[in-house]
């Protein structure tokens, strides 16, 4: 199978490395797939070609010799996707609309890895690009700009570094098209990646987006040293918020007990490699949002989509007090201790409400 990964950030590079390193059978040296990693940044592409490593986004990981590296003005997006069997979009949500518009005539499956909602410019620090609309998940953007595209999402609990190293990881391939799900299983299911299929693309997308916001809250909780009891309560009640929003948007409740819901939430909220968790930890230390984001050097999608999640929930009448507290913190309207007091001071209710 010929596979092109668009976007050479940490996750795109990791998936390309893992897939390029897969072989036909145990004991064989024959590559299972022909994999291309494409990026717009000319300097990044040249550096990867020269060093056979992505030291900017995934340092310490060697790029396999059979991984093709393209882009940077030498190879256009159209040229990169031509003749491929599967197109993977490993870019931030902010790039999804433009890419899907460019690929709307693609005759092969197009699958994204990004987790989040489009966000208004005012909610995004550091001068994010203007967007045509906001509040949409990628499958909703696709419905607007590329209705005939056979598309899906690959999601679940997955730190890029562990995927690149070939450590065991389980993911969900979600699409309303069975052929897209089958293509993802054929492409990635192997010795280190286990792929589960789902047709609940709404649930898988909501889980992947909302967990980033909740991970900021959990990082804050741990940074304030509120204890393991508080962390467990926050994750559990956060899962309830995620499920309420997802079901209201048309997802199945059981999806949120799976890899793309509970699994991804636990990993992102507690794992030390989590960017969103790091934002919460730094806010707890008294750093400003701008300082926290700048120190990451990478995108933390929870910062970019938190307000959109809350706005979407409010428009649907969905109660999300933890997510609301995160937005108030990011906006500087609440201090960490005040956010904790506000959450603990809410009136009693039943657990499943």
From Swiss-Prot:
It catalyses: sn-glycerol 3-phosphate + NAD(+) = dihydroxyacetone phosphate + NADH + H(+); sn-glycerol 3-phosphate + NADP(+) = dihydroxyacetone phosphate + NADPH + H(+). Transmembrane segments: none annotated. InterPro entries: 6-PGluconate_DH-like_C_sf, 6PGD_dom2, G3P_DH_NAD-dep, G3P_DH_NAD-dep_C, G3P_DH_NAD-dep_N, NAD(P)-bd_dom_sf. NADPH binds at residues 11, 40, 115, 160, 275, 299, 301. Keywords: Cytoplasm, Lipid biosynthesis, Lipid metabolism, NAD, NADP, Nucleotide-binding, Oxidoreductase, Phospholipid biosynthesis, Phospholipid metabolism. One of its GO terms (biological process) is glycerol-3-phosphate catabolic process. It is found in: Cytoplasm. Catalyzes the reduction of the glycolytic intermediate dihydroxyacetone phosphate (DHAP) to sn-glycerol 3-phosphate (G3P), the key precursor for phospholipid synthesis. This is Glycerol-3-phosphate dehydrogenase [NAD(P)+]. The gene is gpsA.
């Amino acid at each position: 199978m010929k596979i092109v990964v668009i976007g050479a950030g940490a996750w795109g590079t990791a998936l390309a490395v893992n897939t390029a390193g897969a072989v036909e059978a145990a004991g064989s040296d024959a590559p299972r797939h022909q994999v291309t990693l494409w990026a717009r940044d000319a300097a990044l592409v040249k550096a990867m070609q020269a060093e056979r490593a992505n030291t900017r986004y995934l340092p310490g990981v060697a790029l396999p010799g059979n991984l093709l590296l393209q882009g940077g003005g030498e190879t256009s997006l159209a040229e990169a996707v031509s003749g491929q069997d599967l197109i993977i979009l490993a870019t931030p949500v902010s790039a999804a609309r433009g890419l899907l518009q460019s690929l709307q005539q693609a005759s092969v499956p197009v699958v994204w890895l990004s987790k989040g909602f489009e966000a208004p410019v005012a909610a995004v620090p550091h001068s994010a690009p203007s967007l045509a609309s906001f509040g949409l998940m990628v499958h909703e953007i696709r419905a607007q700009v590329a209705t005939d595209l056979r598309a899906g999402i690959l999601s679940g609990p997955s730190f890029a570094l562990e995927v690149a190293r070939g450590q065991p990881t389980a993911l969900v391939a979600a699409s309303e098209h069975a052929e897209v799900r089958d293509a993802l299983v054929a492409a990635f299911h192997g010795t280190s990646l286990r792929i589960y299929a789902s047709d609940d693309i709404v649930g898988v997308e909501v889980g992947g987006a909302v967990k980033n916001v909740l991970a900021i809250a959990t990082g804050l909780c741990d940074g304030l040293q509120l204890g393991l009891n508080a962390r467990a309560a926050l994750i559990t009640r956060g899962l309830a918020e995620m499920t309420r929003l997802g079901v209201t948007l048309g997802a199945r409740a059981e999806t949120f007990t799976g890899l793309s819901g509970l699994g991804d939430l636990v990993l992102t909220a507690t794992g030390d490699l989590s960017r969103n968790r790091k934002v919460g930890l730094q806010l707890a230390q008294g750093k400003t949002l701008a300082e926290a984001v700048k120190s990451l050097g990478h995108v933390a999608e929870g910062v970019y989509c938190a307000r959109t999640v809350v706005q979407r929930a409010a428009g649907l009448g969905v109660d999300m007090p933890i997510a609301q507290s995160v937005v108030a913190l990011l906006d500087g309207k609440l201090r960490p201790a005040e956010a904790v007091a506000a959450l603990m001071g809410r009136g009693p209710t039943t657990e499943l409400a």
